[in-house]
């Protein structure tokens, strides 16, 4: 078993979700900026911080820098723990404590021992993409995620349209038949040719008024 093949993607909402980041270096700074931009409440604990943290603290109300020493009880206040220190002994201790408390944690120094991984993410109007590659190569993840976003943007209008259809047929007996019809290469072809309304009217005229 390994953490790459034995994993599943979960989209974590930033609304009312508190995250503790242990560390104040460049790695912690990158993770902090990513999480702040997604609306999470982020508290960072370290004896000292990279100077760029001060700029973040002035720009984000959902960021708090904590200079006090670490205590085990502190972990109870947070939904997710992110380990970003270069102290292997300390990191190992935090992993053990988190496991004993059934806390989800990300160890950026040992992703293979983490309960979660912070994937590269990108969003278009209607599609969110998360990407993880095997091993540690964050620049490759970001590069491929950017390419994926550009590709998926072409489907934004299609996704918006079929989601509207999906929400309008939830009480119909032939719902699954309709969903299989619109979620297909054939229907996508006609959508891209701007003939999707005509095709729906031909096969499912009752949907046009919706």
Residues covered by each model-derived region:
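Glycine-rich, highly charged phosphate/nucleotide-binding loops
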Residues: 58-73
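An accessory alpha-helical subdomain
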Residues: 133-210
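NAD(P)-binding Rossmann-fold cofactor-contacting core
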Residues: 30, 38-56
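Short beta-strand and adjoining strand-loop segment in the mid-core
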Residues: 39-43, 79-88, 127-136
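Glycine-rich adenosine-cofactor-binding loop
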Residues: 8-33, 46, 161-176
């Amino acid at each position: 078993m390994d953490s790459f093949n034995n994993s599943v993607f979960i989209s974590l909402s930033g609304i009312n979700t508190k995250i503790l980041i242990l560390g104040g270096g460049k790695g912690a700074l990158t993770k902090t900026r990513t999480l702040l931009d997604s609306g999470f409440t982020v508290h960072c604990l370290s004896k000292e911080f990279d100077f760029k943290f001060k700029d973040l603290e002035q720009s984000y109300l959902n960021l708090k820098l904590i200079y006090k020493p670490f205590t085990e009880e502190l972990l109870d206040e947070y939904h997710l723990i992110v380990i970003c220190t270069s102290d292997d002994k300390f990191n190992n201790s935090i992993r053990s404590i988190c496991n004993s408390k059934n806390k989800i944690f990300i160890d950026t120094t040992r992703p293979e021992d983490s309960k979660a991984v912070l994937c590269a993410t990108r969003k278009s109007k209607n599609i969110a993409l998360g990407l993880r590659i095997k091993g540690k190569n964050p620049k490759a993840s970001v590069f491929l995620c950017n390419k994926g976003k550009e590709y998926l943007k072409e489907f934004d209008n299609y996704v918006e349209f079929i989601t509207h259809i999906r929400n309008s047929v939830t009480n119909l007996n032939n719902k699954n038949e309709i969903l299989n019809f619109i979620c297909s290469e054939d229907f996508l072809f006609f959508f891209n040719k701007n003939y999707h309304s005509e095709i729906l009217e031909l096969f499912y005229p009752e949907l046009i008024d919706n």
